[in-house]
Amino acid sequence: MKRILIALVRFYQRFISPVFPPSCRFELTCSNYMIQAIEKHGFKGVLMGLARILRCHPWSKTGKDPVPDHFSLKRNQEGE
C-alpha cells in the first residue's frame, strides 16, 4: 500500500508539479513531506500530508516543518 501511495505522489512530482510555478512555503516541499510521512506512518501519513497541504498558504508561517516521529496533524514545532 505504501508503494502505491508513494508512486502517486511521485507521479504528481514528475508530471503535474512542473506545470505550475513553485509555491510551497516550507523547506521540505509538501509532496516530499507526504512521501516521508507515508514512509514513517503508513496510511496515516496521507492524512498528515493533506493537513500539511492545507497549512501551505500565503498567510502561513514559512520554514522547516519536518515529519514528526509520532502521528500528528499539527505543525512540528521542533522544526522552528
Swiss-Prot record:
Bias (Basic and acidic residues) ranges: 62-80
Domain of life: Bacteria
Keywords noted in UniProt: Cell membrane, Membrane
Keyword Cell membrane found: yes
Region (Disordered): 61-80
Pfam families: YidD
Chloroplast among keywords: no
Location within or outside the cell: Cell membrane
Membrane topology summary: Peripheral membrane protein
GO cellular component, one term: plasma membrane
Family indicated by similarity: Belongs to the UPF0161 family.
PANTHER family from the UniProt entry: MEMBRANE PROTEIN INSERTION EFFICIENCY FACTOR-RELATED
Purpose: Could be involved in insertion of integral membrane proteins into the membrane.
Protein name: Putative membrane protein insertion efficiency factor
Organism listed in the record: Streptococcus pneumoniae serotype 2 (strain D39 / NCTC 7466)
